[in-house]
């Protein structure tokens, strides 16, 4: 099929997915093959230009992803950078990840999708995506297409050379962005080592490196963040991976920000979600939002910008 015909078909898929209707197995296979062709050209430290809107964990909460797009602007009108964890825990992992991948294939320059610790064969077999694929398709093929694709997702992104974005955090094995560029990412997320750390680590109030309670990655203190940012000419590390009740949370004297974009996480945590808008001068503002109204609930959205210089 020629490019023009495929683009037309892709637009129909996006339209269908926007209504939370899954694609069929063959369509998913085609989509994942096209996505691999695009992602294989992307770097472990993918360069992104502002303006861009940075988002944290989504975790299969499809209707809340729709709310995110309502508040932040539709793709491709708004440039997006998602920091991983598209699947597991929510009820619509299939539709959520398929839509994000379809948008990536349709508008490769307008959306960047990074790998989270849940974009893994092992984790998805425990936390819901595998079972959901089985339930919705009757076999594990779609799960296999996506988990094979996950190996191609970039690990980190760099916005205008200054804001470093990734799912988890820093690694004792990594001092510079060049160390990250040199990693071989085309594999299942390892149990330990630098690639694992980037997807699993968390900032901590204690200085230095610590053992992570998660059983993978490390905790890292403000001294580590400051040293890393200074050595690499960065102004900020932006990451996701942790539930924060306001949707975003500064730490390490504003060297690190956590962004979490799944409101009322697991449909019971009661948290707000947030996204971070970076304008063309890299000034940031956070937009917070509540869960999408479910059917029968009054439609109220909360758009509350907080501006910081």
Curated annotation (Swiss-Prot):
The modification Leucine methyl ester is found at residue 309. Its cofactor is Mn(2+). One of its GO terms (cellular component) is spindle pole. Mn(2+) 1 binds at residues 57, 59, 85. Keywords: Centromere, Chromosome, Cytoplasm, Cytoskeleton, Hydrolase, Manganese, Metal-binding, Methylation, Nucleus, Phosphoprotein, Protein phosphatase, Ubl conjugation. The active site is at residue 118. Changing residue 59 to Q: Catalytically inactive. No effect on interaction with PPME1. Pfam families: Metallophos. GO terms for biological process: apoptotic mitochondrial changes; mitotic cell cycle; negative regulation of canonical NF-kappaB signal transduction; negative regulation of gene expression; negative regulation of Ras protein signal transduction; negative regulation of tumor necrosis factor-mediated signaling pathway; proteasome-mediated ubiquitin-dependent protein catabolic process; protein dephosphorylation. It catalyses: O-phospho-L-seryl-[protein] + H2O = L-seryl-[protein] + phosphate; O-phospho-L-threonyl-[protein] + H2O = L-threonyl-[protein] + phosphate. Its main location: cytoplasm. Binds 2 manganese ions per subunit. It comes from the Eukaryota. One of its GO terms (molecular function) is protein serine/threonine phosphatase activity. Gene3D superfamilies: 3.60.21.10. Its EC number is 3.1.3.16. Disulfide bonds: none annotated. It is an enzyme of class 3 (hydrolase). The modification Phosphotyrosine is found at residue 307. Mn(2+) 2 binds at residues 85, 117, 167, 241. PP2A consists of a common heterodimeric core enzyme (composed of a 36 kDa catalytic subunit (subunit C) and a 65 kDa constant regulatory subunit (PR65) (subunit A)) that associates with a variety of regulatory subunits. Proteins that associate with the core dimer include three families of regulatory subunits B (the R2/B/PR55/B55, R3/B''/PR72/PR130/PR59 and R5/B'/B56 families), the 48 kDa variable regulatory subunit, viral proteins, and cell signaling molecules. Binds PPME1. May indirectly interact with SGO1, most probably through regulatory B56 subunits. Interacts with CTTNBP2NL. Catalytic subunit of protein phosphatase 2A (PP2A), a serine/threonine phosphatase involved in the regulation of a wide variety of enzymes, signal transduction pathways, and cellular events. PP2A can modulate the activity of phosphorylase B kinase, casein kinase 2, mitogen-stimulated S6 kinase, and MAP-2 kinase. Part of the striatin-interacting phosphatase and kinase (STRIPAK) complexes. STRIPAK complexes have critical roles in protein (de)phosphorylation and are regulators of multiple signaling pathways including Hippo, MAPK, nuclear receptor and cytoskeleton remodeling. This is Serine/threonine-protein phosphatase 2A catalytic subunit beta isoform. It comes from Homo sapiens (Human). The gene is PPP2CB.
């Amino acid at each position: 099929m020629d490019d023009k015909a495929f683009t037309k078909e892709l637009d129909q898929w996006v339209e269908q997915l926007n209504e939370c209707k899954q694609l069929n197995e063959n369509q998913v296979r085609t989509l994942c093959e096209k996505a691999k062709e695009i992602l294989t050209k992307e770097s472990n430290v993918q360069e992104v230009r502002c303006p861009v809107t940075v988002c944290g964990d989504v975790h299969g909460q499809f209707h809340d992803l729709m709310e995110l797009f309502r508040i932040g602007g539709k793709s491709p009108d708004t440039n997006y950078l998602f920091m991983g964890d598209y699947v597991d825990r929510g009820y619509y992992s299939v539709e959520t990840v398929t839509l994000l991948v379809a948008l990536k294939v349709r508008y490769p320059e307008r959306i960047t999708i990074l790998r989270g610790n849940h974009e893994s064969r092992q984790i998805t077999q425990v936390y819901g995506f595998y079972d959901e694929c089985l339930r919705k398709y009757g076999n594990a093929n779609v799960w296999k297409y996506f988990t094979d694709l996950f190996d191609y997702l970039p690990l980190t992104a760099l916005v205008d050379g200054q804001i470093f974005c990734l799912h988890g955090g820093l690694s004792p094995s990594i001092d510079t962005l060049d160390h990250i560029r040199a990693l071989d990412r085309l594999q299942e997320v390892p149990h330990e080592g630098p690639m694992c750390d980037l997807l699993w680590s968390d900032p901590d109030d204690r200085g230095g490196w610590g053992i992570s309670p998660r059983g993978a990655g490390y905790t890292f203190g403000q001294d580590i963040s400051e040293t890393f940012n200074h050595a690499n000419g960065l102004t900020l590390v932006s990451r996701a991976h942790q539930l924060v009740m306001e949707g975003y949370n500064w730490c390490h004297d504003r060297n690190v920000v956590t962004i979490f974009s799944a409101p009322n996480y697991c449909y019971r945590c009661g948290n707000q979600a947030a996204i971070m808008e970076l304008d063309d001068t890299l000034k940031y503002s956070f937009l917070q939002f509540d869960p999408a109204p479910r059917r029968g609930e009054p439609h109220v959205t909360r758009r509350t910008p907080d501006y910081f210089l």
